[in-house]
Amino acid sequence: MANLKSTEKKTKAQAMGMHTEVLTGRTQQKFFNPDEAENFYYFGTYDVDFNKRTNLDVKDMTAAEANKKIDSLMSEGYGTIVIKNPQGKHSLGVGILNKLNLIFEGSLGYFGMGSCDGPIVRINGRVGWSCAENLMAGKVVIEKNAGSCFGAAIRGGDLICKGSVGARTGIDMKGGTIIIGGDAGAFTGFMMQRGRIIILGDVGINLGDSMYDGTIFIGGQIGSYGSDAVDSELTKSDQDWLKRKLKVAEIGENFDVSKMKKIVAGKKLWNYDNLEPTEKKGAI
């Protein structure tokens, strides 16, 4: 009985995707002193003033030139930068490891806002594939629609699309929250490991396929469930959290979260290599 309880503790996942995994001799948990919060900066980041605002027209710039200019403006202390005429350029706004208010007046191409940590971004248009890939922290809001692989491998922060998104949204995500106001395509949450996905509309086939952990909330119809994705009880705590999150995201006003479906990992794939051949067939 004691061994059973010990095993349960080692595999227990907290609610809403906050997973705690006990590993021999080490832990994935990190502890920081609040008094030292302002000491954690990346090399090459800048102190900026959010009240110091400027416009940047990138119509005749390449993506590399535009990104270098954004960095230069931050070095001058600008904390709010409005990008004019992005015109669907790929890889705009990537690699920003700084606190910053960034506003795009238009649409972005592929890989916009990838590998960022800290900025607050509003895109008044659409985005292509892999928007905000590897986001570490901050907030990215898309006013219209997004392409496939939206929020791939994000580790933190809030990623919000007020329209619909393509396939493989949240693929391999390891934390953070993705919120979709419309519909999502096939394989949403594929190989998801941590974090939460909220979709107010419908979702395509193979939802949560091969997900290891995390939580997916769906407000509409589900095309089909992927391997090891199962329904779970929507608790009062879940509903309260959803209401708060949607309110802060300024999306889904008056949406009835009590009717949402909650999908989690069935955990059959956790020890896949140790299963018998007949059990492996049932797991996938």
Where are these regions (language model features)?
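Glycine- and acidic-residue-rich phosphate-binding/metal-coordinating active-site segment common to enzymes
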Residues: 167, 173-183, 194
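Feature marks extracellular polysaccharide-active and adherence modules
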Residues: 84-86, 95, 105-107, 114-115, ...
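Beta-strand repeat architectures
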Residues: 69-80, 91-100, 111-119, 130-136, ...
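Extracellular/lumenal glycan-associated surfaces
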Residues: 99-107, 119-120, 138, 157-158, ...
